[in-house]
Amino acid sequence: MAANIQTYLENIRKPWGQIYYDILFAQLKDIKGKRVLDFGSGFGLVANHLAKENQVLAVEPNEEMVALQAQDHPYQQLVGSLDQIESFEDASFDVILCHNVLEYVEDRKVVLKEFTRLLKPGGLLSIVKHNEVGRVLQTVVFENDTQKALDLLAGQDLETHSMGLAQAYDLDRVVEDLALEVQDYQGIRVFYALQDNRFKGQEGWRESMLKMELAVCQESPYRDIAFFQHYRLKRS
């Protein structure tokens, strides 16, 4: 297994990796009885969770991640990228998920145009993306690396531990000429990434921090300083 994939998997299994999914699943709880496309499905954690009450198709280009996929509930898994979905009929899906993917894509517009084609009118596009303010806060407070934070402010891409360079982007600009309208956004990782990891193994930490994150995830200014932002867009 490639070292970066192993690091990513180990991080997900830590309390600070698990709570990300606790928060995300709470924000996706209204998705039931839908046909769902999870584009860039990774280890399949979100696809597997939603497959309990939905018909889910997952697409992931990394074969190592697919080999380690979670599949407690039945869903279809394809290995690939746009090549796997270009043959699908128009308006094939009620919901499309694209979580922490577009930072690593060269031509985001091409991907989003394809999502627009595949979504039914009124359908939901769920995008989780890095938030530049949250990036800088974590770098200064948790990592204590002011030079790296200054580099981020100057426009330098973020070097992630497992997935390489993550390039920030303006979602409003990317979708401005598409039939996609931002409905709302929520924060993920408002507080927990700013804490020292030694606190995160304490009994009850995950449960209490989840309550705190969910209490503010829909509120400004908290959602505006989160490391991740979860956008919901509607297909017009």
Could you say what each language-model-derived stretch is?
Residues 95-107:
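A short SAM/SAH-binding and catalytic strip from SAM-dependent methyltransferases
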Residues 162-179, 185:
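Short alpha-helix
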Residues 43-84:
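Class I SAM-dependent methyltransferase SAM/SAH-binding core
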Residues 1-32, 45-49, 65-68, 126-152, 196:
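Conserved class I S-adenosyl-L-methionine
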Residues 86-95:
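A short acidic, Gly/Pro-enriched loop at the edge of an enzyme's catalytic core
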Residues 184-236:
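A C-terminal cap/extension of S-adenosyl-L-methionine-dependent methyltransferases
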Residues 109-124:
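A short glycine-rich, Lys/Arg-flanked "PGG" loop and its adjoining helix->strand segment in the class I
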